[in-house]
């Protein structure tokens, strides 16, 4: 991700908890990546115009404090752009307990309404929400479908044995994954 964004900005840095991930990013892509938590990074007092979190907020044990740390490191009118799934989406509702994003390592589940409230209480305003279309392998999609429709597992297993599907990618949008755009509420705006 850093390799894609770096040519389009004046400066870029990333956070990665994996030492291997940091070393790899530095060695292969010449990226500035800190091997530390957001809490420790906030102590550096570095300010950013934009913070991007891709599919990570649901993994934090305390996403509320994480958003507070992000607010601390954002410049005035800075942007937080993040992705996560909407537990209140139509697709999540119709699949119920078989919803494929209900996983042990997802510690929190958010609706658009709760995310707006959580951000606003921490001086960030979500001003745009858009659907996030993903490109996935057919094999990966079939794995997910097996979990959603367990009674059709044998059909999905048979399709997975067709070799052409192992390397075929498709775009998928179940209208449950969203990109959220939030702006730090400026002090001037708060004084009005």
Place the predicted regions along the sequence by residue:
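A C-terminal cap/extension of S-adenosyl-L-methionine-dependent methyltransferases
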Residues: 130-192
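A SAM-dependent methyltransferase catalytic signature shared across enzymes that methylate proteins
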Residues: 112-132, 157
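Short secondary-structure boundary/capping segments
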Residues: 23, 99, 170-171
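Acceptor-substrate binding/catalytic loop of class I
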Residues: 99-113
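Short glycine/proline- and charge-enriched loop/turn segments
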Residues: 95-103, 143-150
């Amino acid at each position: 991700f850093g390799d894609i964004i770096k040519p389009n900005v004046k400066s870029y840095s990333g956070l990665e908890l994996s030492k291997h991930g940091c070393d790899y990013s530095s060695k292969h892509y010449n990226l500035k990546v800190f091997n530390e938590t957001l809490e420790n990074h906030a102590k550096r007092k570095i300010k950013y115009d934009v913070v991007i979190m891709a599919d990570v907020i649901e993994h934090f044990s305390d996403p509320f404090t994480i958003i507070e740390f992000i607010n601390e490191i954002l410049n005035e009118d800075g942007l937080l752009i993040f992705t996560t799934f909407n537990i209140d989406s139509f697709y999540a509702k119709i699949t119920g307990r078989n919803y494929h994003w209900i996983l042990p390592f997802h510690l929190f589940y958010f609706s658009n309404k709760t995310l707006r409230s959580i951000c606003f209480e921490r001086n960030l305003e979500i001003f745009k929400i858009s659907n996030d279309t993903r490109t996935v392998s057919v094999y990966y999609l079939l794995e997910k479908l097996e979990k959603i429709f367990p009674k059709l597992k044998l059909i999905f297993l048979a399709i997975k044995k067709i070799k052409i599907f192992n390397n075929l990618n498709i775009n998928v949008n179940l209208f449950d994954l969203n990109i959220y755009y939030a702006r730090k509420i400026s002090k001037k705006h708060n004084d009005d």
